[in-house]
Amino acid sequence: MQEKSKPVDNLRADAEKIITRAIAAVLPDAAVERALKGKTFLGRVYLVAAGKAAWQMAHAARACLQDNFCGGVVVTKYGHVNGEIANVACFEGGHPVPDENSLRGTDAALALTEDLTESDTVVFLLSGGGSALFEKPLLPLAELQDVTNQLLAAGADIVEINTIRKRLSAVKGGRFARHCAPAQVFAVVLSDILGDPLDMIASGPAYPDSSSCAQALDIAKRYGLHLSERAWALLAQETPKTLTNVETQITGSVRELCAAAAAACEALGYEPMILTDCLCCEAREAGSMLASIARTHARDGKNLAFLMGGETVVHLREKGLGGRNQEIALSAALGIEGLSNALVFSVGSDGTDGPTDAAGGIADGETAQLMRQKGVDAVQSLNDNDAYHALGAVGGLLKTGATGTNVNDVTVLLLRTAE
């Protein structure tokens, strides 16, 4: 007689299906195909792709762009070119700090898009990492690298870093779109920043800049940046505030990731509820919050799914191993212990979570007890920021491998009706 599966087994099987379907919906090739489906462009068509997902996006776009295609350029991270693309030159450069090869690729893109007419179109594909990879500095490269390193070392956030970068570049802050004018620019964006601020994704090469020179100067002074007179003068200059030749479409973001995960939940018989797609709290707090929701609704008699998208933070207290998604799962494990019909998983869409080979973590009502049986102190592991080893001891690590996309993270609480 075949042994009846336990509720946690069903929950884990569902979690695997949800993860697979959610990530598939935001892969670069699928995102580009959605954006270009049914689009027609008059005149000559050029392709420029920049970012960590640039090769995949360009590969998909090239299959869609047949008529009047005149050439393209890809600038992506080292190791991210996966073969030749017909009539497209591919460059690999430095990330998170630009190098000479980043500049060579950008120079090729600028040369390709020079002297265009108003009947021409530049299909511009943008993804995370574009700030470093798509660069034409208005300063010597070594000086720009030093400014970037100063900002990173000072703990500046991505918005602050990009506010500075825009003013030190000939392509950021809308300047690439202005370079392409009078040609039309059709920008397809794979967003890796919460809220999808188009002027901040890859420092907005094809979008009007909403930041001001006053803000840039304030950031530089607040972090005590050591800058040349030329750099200070550039920070005091304004960037383009209006662009009339650009159409932009966000085709992959944490919103799409959450929506796809919710659709997968619904297909599996759950009632999904997206709590937020801008999650940005402490990771362990997110885990505790979902555990509280689980205890509130565990006996509702319904199959429920609560979803959150975004990017939590981890304040390192000790030198353990883990990542924000693993820490969410470990925190949740403590809160849902004993609930036979509850499971929490959290996964990074890029397939990596912190400095580990895991994409995230998964925990159910038995996880904390299993840890004790294995001699693992879950509370101490959480305090030591050592979620990787704690979850790894009980099969709680999610490993997808590199996915080729990056649209933040998705966290899901599943509750099944007791069977």
Label for each model-derived stretch:
Residues 1-44, 48, 56, 81, ...:
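N-terminal amphipathic/basic leader segments beginning at the initiator methionine
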Residues 48-50, 73-76, 123-128, 187-193, ...:
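Short beta-strand segments
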Residues 60-68, 87-90, 110-114, 137-150, ...:
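A glycine- and small-aliphatic-rich helix-loop capping segment at beta-alpha/alpha-beta transitions
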Residues 75-119, 160, 164-165:
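Glycine-rich oxoanion-binding loops at beta->alpha junctions
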Residues 165, 183-186, 208-289, 293:
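Accessory alpha-helical/coil subdomains and C-terminal extensions
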Residues 269-346, 354-355:
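Active-site segments that bind and position negatively charged phosphate/pyrophosphate groups
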Residues 330-419:
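Internal helix-turn-beta structural module
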